[in-house]
Curated annotation (Swiss-Prot):
Residue intervals passing through the bilayer: none
HAMAP family noted in UniProt: GreA_GreB
Name the UniProt record assigns to this protein: Transcription elongation factor GreA
Lineage: Bacteria, Pseudomonadati, Pseudomonadota, Alphaproteobacteria, Sphingomonadales
InterPro entries: GreA/GreB_C_sf, TF_GreA/GreB_CS, Tscrpt_elong_fac_GreA, Tscrpt_elong_fac_GreA/B, Tscrpt_elong_fac_GreA/B_C, Tscrpt_elong_fac_GreA/B_fam, Tscrpt_elong_fac_GreA/B_N, Tscrpt_elong_fac_GreA/B_N_sf
Gene3D superfamilies attached to this UniProt entry: Transcription elongation factor, GreA/GreB, C-terminal domain, Transcription elongation factor, GreA/GreB, N-terminal domain
GO biological process: DNA-templated transcription elongation; regulation of DNA-templated transcription elongation
GO molecular function, one term: DNA binding
Length: 158
């Protein structure tokens, strides 16, 4: 039997997933009602409301299945319980870029990543380059605009 790959995530990411799942499950009956109402309007071949409701139902069901899968595989990680001198999932890292300007990122799961909030996926090019690194190590990352160089300045588990 194949093992199920766990999805590491922070508690906040798990809460966001479960909230989205709950909202979609609550939307299900409204979609069924919309389909029934549209059906009552007669000819389904030219019934835009019916086709829109059926399309939305398909989208919602697919998203629910995806979210249920992710929730079932979730492995919640609390960064405050971690320690060490290497960058791992959940670590908050301060880097110095080419201009010696400090930038701070937290290593998170792919579904939690939000670069604007300083949260990068361990699967991203920068995330992959950081995992396993220590303070004072230099890393090189190839991004669409070219190669970027960083120096690991600090590793925290907060």
């Amino acid at each position: 039997m194949a093992s199920v790959e766990k999805l590491p995530m922070l508690a906040e990411g798990y809460e966001k997933l479960t909230a989205e799942l709950k909202a979609l499950r609550e939307e299900r009956p409204r979609i069924v009602d919309a389909i029934e109402e549209a059906r009552a309007h007669g000819d389904l071949s030219e019934n835009a409301e019916y086709h829109a409701a059926k399309e939305r139902q398909g989208q919602v069901e697919a998203t629910i299945a995806d979210l249920e899968d992710r929730v079932s595989r979730a492995q919640i990680i609390d960064p405050t319980t971690l320690s060490g001198d290497k960058i791992i999932f959940g670590a908050t890292v301060t880097l110095l870029d080419d201009d010696e300007k400090p930038v701070k990122y937290q290593i998170v799961g792919p579904y939690e990543a939000d670069a604007k909030k300083g949260m990068i996926s361990y699967n991203s090019p920068l995330g992959k380059a950081l995992i396993g690194r220590k303070v004072d190590e230099e890393i090189e990352v190839t991004v669409p605009s070219g190669d970027k160089f960083y120096l690991v300045q600090k590793i925290e588990f907060i």
